[in-house]
Amino acid sequence: EKQQTALAEDLRILASCLLDEQLPLIEGAIRIKVLLDNYDAELGQHPRCQVFQQLFEATEQVPTHAAWKALDKSERRRHEAQFSALELRHKAEARRSARWLLDEALPKSRDAA
């Protein structure tokens, strides 16, 4: 119960950050997808949340952290171009889905109560 409340709050924060553009779209979508899987797998499969799954799957082969730094510049640029294309294609839908999570799918924040 406590963990679910914490996960819901983390999801609300991530969705807000994605909407406020405080977080890169791809990173935000991946984080939301992973948290949704832990919070409520059924909600994660909801059609309104599919964009997060799509962005996760489209980028899961991309190296992260030290492996990213180890890539040569042309490889990094190729991945960055892919990110830009994905962002253009999915930004509006990801923003709508984040707004839906905040307004309808997730319990209201304790602060708002």
Annotate each PLM feature.
Residues E1-A113:
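Acidic, Ser/Pro/Thr-rich low-complexity regulatory regions
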